[in-house]
Structure formats: structure tokens, C-alpha cells
Amino acid sequence: MEPVYSWGNTHLDFVDPEIYDLIEKEKHRQCRGIELIAAENFTSVAVMEALGSCLTNKYSEGMPGNRYYGGTEFIDEIESLCRSRSLEAFHCNPEKWGVNVQPYSGSPANFAAYTALLQPHDRIMGLDLPSGGHITHGYYSSGGKNISATSIYFENLPYKVDSKTGYIDYDKLEEKAMDFRPKLIICGGTSYPREWDYARFRAVADKVGAFLLCDMAHNSALVAAQEAADPFEYCDVVTTSTHKSLRGPRAGMIFYRKGPKPAKKGQPEGEVYDFDAKINSAVFPALQSGPHNNKIGALAVALKQVMAPSFKVYAKQVKANAACLASYLINKGYTLVTDGTDNHLILWDLRPLGLTGNKVEKVCELCYITLNRNAVFGDTSFLAPGGVRIGTPAMTSRGLVEKDFEKIGEFLHRAVTITLDIQEQYGKVMKDFNKGLVNNKEIDEIKADVEEFTYDFDMPGFFISESRND
């Protein structure tokens, strides 16, 4: 049998040089590029150490103190600490709120919450995908095809933004809800740049007798830092992923109300919330088996960092950087959905330029600027939508401030100008457009400028000098 030191204690670069080299290339890409995908961030070396720790070895079905495996003494302590830190980080009273930290990521957290609250074919209302919602909030394609499990197992009617302003049309939301009578209303999204009126959502939910769930995956850092409206004041359940603005590992959390319900007309006296058992059993055994203990340990570390005073400074800067970049692009004459932002992201409408998001995404990628194509209201194609989404958390984590985001705005302006020139010369068809990307000197110039620009900023998680590709 092969000795343990041989297979078990040999480093990656020797065991698998191919994977090691690809990781080094990805490390170089992250270091030398401008990361503007709103759903991405850079986590800390402390979180990475927990992710790569011996916690990955342990299996632990069940909840702390009630496991189906032995040897979970320290795993129980870690998960209990993670749960208590979750509540503290989001300013939740543990007598009124519980939390499950076992979901593998944000999408499983959402579906576990639906499984706990609903029966198959119950009705859901979430923000329409082209309006800024998420695919797990229920979405049908224009042909009526079910896109996600949410739309397969539940009946969905989306609410939308106003076509002129880009803001959520709360009056139409209420009108639809009164007709549709959903059992669950979802607030939260992936590309909505404005604040959420949770009080209005609560009022609508109460009118139709619906649960109210907030998916705060994108702006959870702003909520924790009290730089955004608080969904916990109005919602029954709050879900989130943990790797976006929160800067944690790829995991998920479900917060839920517990204890006595507030007095309400027509409600029996002394009634209590029953979410605790339903949500915990929906996560396990209904949808998952053993939790990923390395992620839970890493999340506990990230939450400790969230509670540090420096995290609030970071959250404030995320918003300031987004506002600065939005102002720069508007001053250049570009069109932003809602004419700006209240949070960490910008939705850039490229349709007035005659461009599609996939073309701008491709040119930016070649310039070492990473962003993503994104639907804007009225789009019918998600492969070639009319916009791009831009987020500020990742580069804020590297220490960039307003003046640096003005420089990023300049890079984006140059990239879009190149995109327009290529389209004019080669045409709108993508296979023809791609010909203009080959050996393009202007793209190479931006790429070189971007690499020089990013060189001065530290990289969370590792030292740039340690990369083999530098």
C-alpha cells in the first residue's frame, strides 16, 4: 500500500502540476484584472485557511447536539458559534430569530425555505428576471418553459419594474397580488440598483395573507453594516448566500422568525411562529445530507470579520464607489437603469448605443475587465441582452476608492468606444464582430494599462508576489 506521506502529504504542485498551473493562471487573472462582477468578491486568507482545513473530513448529519454521527463535539461548537455570530452580525435578537447555516449556497437556501413554507403548486410572486430578479424566485421563458425548480414545483406570477423609471411598480405589485393571492412574496434581486421598500412589501403580504421572504444575497454586507434598509424588521424569512458583498465562502444561510407572533386581528392569542422545525427539516433531511463543515467554519470566520469596525468602512466605500462610477458614466452620456444606484451595483443600458451586453462583455474581458451581460427590462434574449451589470465590492476589497473608480470608468468608456468601432467596421453578427477582436492594438493597449493600474493594489487571500505567473 502507498505510504501516507506519499499520497496524503505531498503538495499540489507535485501531485497535479496541471491543476496547479491552472490555479496559478487564475490567480494571475484575478490579480491583474479589474473584477466588476457584482456577485463576486475576494475573500480573506483566514477564510481560505478554514476552507482548506481538516473540517472538510468530517461528516455530521443533523443539528448541533443531535447528530447521526459520532465524533462531532468540535463540529457542534463550530456550527453553534457560526449561528450565534450570524445573528449578532445581522443585529438579530436570538429570542426572536433563528438561523440555519447548513445550506450549500444561496440557491439551495432559497429552495429549502420554499420547501418549508409551501406545498407543491402553491403560488409565489418574485421580481421578474429582466426586471432584476433571480432565477430561483420563479421564472418562465417567453414560451412558457419552466427555467428553475421554483417554476417547476410552484405557480409563479412575477411583479415588474416600471418600464419608464426602472423602479419597482409597487402599485401594480399590489394589484397583481390581490388577484393572484400568492402564499409567498419574495423581495430581493440580482440586478436591481435601488433600495427595497420592505414596509410596502409587508403591507401587501398582509393584505393577501402571504409569507414575506427577502433574498439579500447581493446586499447582505450593506444590511449587516446598516448601510441598507433592514429586511429583518418586516420579513418572516431572510435568505442569503455568503460569498458576494459579505466576502465569505460559498455557502448559504436561512434566517427565520421564532417565538410569539405579534398580536393581530383575527389571530389566536399566544400564537407562535413554527418556522424553526420546518426550515431545519427542509434543509436536512429533505434537501441535503451532511453539511460542508469547512464552509461553516469559514463562514464563522467571515462573520467575525463582518463585525469588525473596518467592515462598515468597507460597506460605506462600496456604495460610494458605485455612486462615483455611476456619476462618471452618466456624465459621459451613457444610460443607466434608474439613472444611478443606491447600493453596490449599476445596470448599464447599452440599447441606446445599438450594442448588446455580450459584445461589451467580450471586449472588456480581452481588456482584463470582468463584468457580465445582463438583461434590462424589455429584453427577450439572455444570450445577447441589452445591458451589462457592474458591481464594486471586489475592487473595493482591494482598497480602491472614488478616484480609482473614475479611472475604471475611463477604461470602460474606452472599451465601449472600441466595441462601437468594431461593430461599425465588421457588423452586428457575432461571428463577424469577433473578427475585429483579433490582433486589436487598442484592446492590447487597454489591457496593458489595466495591468499597470491593478499592480499597485494588494490582493486579499494571497500575496501577488507568490504567483508563479508574476
Curated annotation (Swiss-Prot):
KW Secreted (keyword) present: no
Protein name: Serine hydroxymethyltransferase 5
SUPFAM superfamilies: PLP-dependent transferases
Subcellular location: Cytoplasm
Molecular function terms, GO-annotated: glycine hydroxymethyltransferase activity; pyridoxal phosphate binding
Coiled-coil segments: none
Stored HAMAP family: SHMT (MF_00051)
EC number: 2.1.2.1
Recorded superkingdom: Eukaryota
Cellular-component GO terms for this entry: cytosol
Annotated function: Catalyzes the interconversion of serine and glycine.
UniProt-listed Pfam families: SHMT
InterPro entries, per database record: PyrdxlP-dep_Trfase (IPR015424), PyrdxlP-dep_Trfase_major (IPR015421), PyrdxlP-dep_Trfase_small (IPR015422), Ser_HO-MeTrfase (IPR001085), Ser_HO-MeTrfase-like (IPR049943), Ser_HO-MeTrfase_PLP_BS (IPR019798), SHMT-like_dom (IPR039429)
Annotated positions of the N6-(pyridoxal phosphate)lysine modification: 244
Originating species: Arabidopsis thaliana
